[in-house]
């Protein structure tokens, strides 16, 4: 089945009002495919501002994190309601940097995912293995474990987009080949079919998220199970438009 091409831009802890305006202006004026969904995720302090700038119909805004409570004494956290209140439609959850630096385990990621979905946000769910896990040959075991935690909590995957991000490729300049990514994505889709049914598996978009850039994005275009990209550093640069247009 045809799944809508999806490109997420994770700005991480980068950007100023000036640089974010430049990024959004580029997207607003660029010639983008009609059948693409683009989600840009600036730091939380700039969410409201970013939403106010976007005019391109293919582009929406998402958060980089949220919490499992609607409100309360949780200093420094962002709530789903607050993200929605400023116009965010999506949130990235389970990113390897959250798992590594902030010790978010599979259970926490699953709880956050369920809460965000229940409150009406779409979720870009990140999964992936470290270099050590890759060398040990346990990539599939790792991503299946990460998926199992969410499958236990979430039954309706309509608003979930999976981002496979090999941790060894993030921000390193290394990238899985398109063939390698296709193999892993196909295995992920097969696992979803086993656990959630073929229909859900066929409808769920699976993105590649390891150092995707303007130079390599085109090599993925004919890979049946690669439905787009979650882009890090390149989302801050003009080549982000090239990635969005890489299916043309």
From Swiss-Prot:
Domain of life: Eukaryota
Principal EC category: isomerase
Pathway(s) it belongs to: Carbohydrate biosynthesis; gluconeogenesis; Carbohydrate degradation; glycolysis; D-glyceraldehyde 3-phosphate from glycerone phosphate: step 1/1
Gene Ontology CC entries for this record: cell surface; cytosol
EC numbers for this chain: 5.3.1.1
HAMAP family the record matches: TIM_B
Protein name, entry field: Triosephosphate isomerase
Gene: TPI1
